[in-house]
């Protein structure tokens, strides 16, 4: 069953964040993931949520998503992301 990660990211160093994105894309794809959304236009329909940048990606399973997310390689790249942005993230299984 497919699994999805959804991030709401507040970027405060765009140049550094772009460096992170360039490095993480091939790692994500090599692990079986694919981007579904990366910072496109979005609209809030309910609540007082004010997302900055929405990033979504899909993996074939939650197991593969977690293998990617908790891998040493991604965690090293995540430290770059943490230096230039803050955010929230969730993972959810598809139907």
Predicted features along the sequence, with ranges:
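Short S/T/G/P-rich N-terminal loop/turn motif that feeds into the first structured element of a domain
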Residues: 1-54, 59-70, 93-95
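C-terminal structural segments of small proteins and small subunits
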Residues: 62-90
């Amino acid at each position: 069953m497919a699994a999805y990660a959804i991030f709401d990211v507040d970027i405060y160093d765009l140049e550094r964040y772009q460096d992170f994105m360039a490095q993480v894309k091939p790692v994500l794809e090599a692990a079986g993931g694919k981007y579904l959304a990366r910072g496109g236009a979005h609209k809030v329909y309910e609540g007082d949520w004010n997302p900055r940048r929405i990033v979504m990606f899909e993996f074939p399973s939650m197991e593969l998503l977690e293998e990617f997310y908790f891998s040493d390689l991604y965690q090293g790249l995540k430290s770059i992301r943490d230096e230039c942005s803050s955010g929230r993230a969730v993972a959810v299984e598809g139907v």
